[in-house]
Amino acid sequence: MKCLFLVCLCLVPIVVFSSTFTSQNPINLPSDATPVLDVTGKELDSRLSYRIISTFWGALGGDVYLGKSPNSDAPCANGVFRYNSDVGPSGTPVRFIGSSSHFGQGIFENELLNIQFAISTSKLCVSYTIWKVGDYDASLGTMLLETGGTIGQADSSWFKIVKSSQLGYNLLYCPVTSTMSCPFSSDDQFCLKVGVVHQNGKRRLALVKDNPLDISFKQVQ
């Protein structure tokens, strides 16, 4: 059964509305909103595609990619994996769709967002590009990341990018019920960390209690 979480409550009605609301300047981002940066120090742009890469090298490295889930009856590749090393294929490009996208093209730390594999695909597989968290996998004791999500869906498709305590960034899974309630909340008590588990010899992204995946972002040229 999929885990259920309480909705995040804000102390103000809508934190994305600035106290300086005027007819000339109706909406501002929170003053403490910090842009997410790529490996070159540039701010992420929702119009561009990126590869999610590891902050480490060798056997500790490896890009994130779209692959076929073991024992899945889905008609398209629907698993979110990480290569076993940074030596080898490049990862599958993604784009980030922020819940505050009406403010511009920037992507910010602690912002609720969707993640989509930015690839050409058939009509049949279009719905298998949006990330989500799947049902509980009893054999692995956790919930695995997969595709088949929905942009704006409040249950299984919301993530956050947060600064890592080590290097780069971490991903959090944050199933809140409304993007307008807390789109920039830094209270992550309702979020779970995204890390890696081993599934049939592959590294599969999944929800973890410890050792979250440390990642960076490299723009696809």
UniProtKB/Swiss-Prot annotation:
Organism domain of life: Eukaryota
Function: Potent inhibitor of serine proteases (chymotrypsin and trypsin). Inhibits tightly human leukocyte elastase (HLE). Does not inhibit papain, pepsin nor cathepsin D (cysteine and aspartic proteases). Protects the plant by inhibiting proteases of invading organisms, decreasing both hyphal growth and zoospores germination of Phytophthora infestans.
Protein name: Serine protease inhibitor 1
Molecular-function annotations in GO: serine-type endopeptidase inhibitor activity
Keyword Signal: yes
Entry keyword Signal: yes
Signal sequence, renumbered to the chain: 1-18
Predominant subcellular localization, coarse grouping: other
Annotated site residues (Reactive bond for chymotrypsin or HLE) in this chain: 143-144
Quaternary context: Heterodimer of chains A and B; disulfide-linked. Double-headed inhibitor able to form triple complexes with target proteases, by binding simultaneously one molecule of trypsin and one molecule of chymotrypsin.
Intrachain S-S bonds: 76-125, 174-191
Cell compartments where the protein resides: Vacuole
Keywords: Disulfide bond, Protease inhibitor, Serine protease inhibitor, Signal, Vacuole
Gene3D superfamilies registered for this protein in UniProt: 2.80.10.50
Short motif Vacuolar targeting signal, span: 25-30
Chain residues in the propeptide: 19-28, 179-184
The species this protein was found in: Solanum tuberosum
Site, Reactive bond for trypsin: residue positions: 95-96
Note: The serine protease inhibitor PSPI-21 comprises two protein species with pI 5.2 and 6.3, denoted as PSPI-21-5.2 and PSPI-21-6.3. They may be encoded by two alleles at the same gene locus.
Induction info: By infection with Phytophthora infestans.
Family membership: Belongs to the protease inhibitor I3 (leguminous Kunitz-type inhibitor) family.
